Design a protein with these regions (language model features):
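N-terminal export/targeting and maturation segments
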Residues: 2-41
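Compact alpha-helical subdomains of small soluble proteins
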Residues: 35-106
Length: 106
């Protein structure tokens, strides 16, 4: 089941800044998602977010961005990008964000 995240779709037209660190990425996601969405994400399989949150991450933080910025983002999530793979990076960001949500008790 693909998770529909209304807030993600609403923010697609927002101007976003590609995060340079995990903390910046988490702060943007925290501001964008509702408490209910964060709670559901913390308990779900991350693959369920590939076509919602994952697509938003790819469209706003990866595709069309400067290579140096995307590499910095990948490095923040402990990924070395030799051959660019946007799906893997967006999945890794969601996995780390899910761990963060679990640590803060959601």
């Amino acid at each position: 089941m693909v998770k529909n995240m209304a807030n993600v779709i609403q923010t697609n037209n927002m101007e976003t800044k590609i995060p340079q660190t995990k903390n910046e990425a988490f702060a943007q996601l925290d501001a964008m998602l509702s408490e209910k969405e964060k709670s559901e994400l913390a308990k779900s399989d991350t693959i369920e977010y590939h076509f919602s949150l994952g697509m938003w991450i790819r469209n706003n933080w990866i595709y069309g961005q400067e290579e140096v910025d995307v590499k910095r983002l990948a490095k923040a999530f402990r990924m070395e990008i030799l051959f660019f793979e946007a799906d893997e990076l967006s999945e890794k960001i969601i996995e780390y964000y899910q761990r963060y949500l679990k640590r803060i008790g959601l």
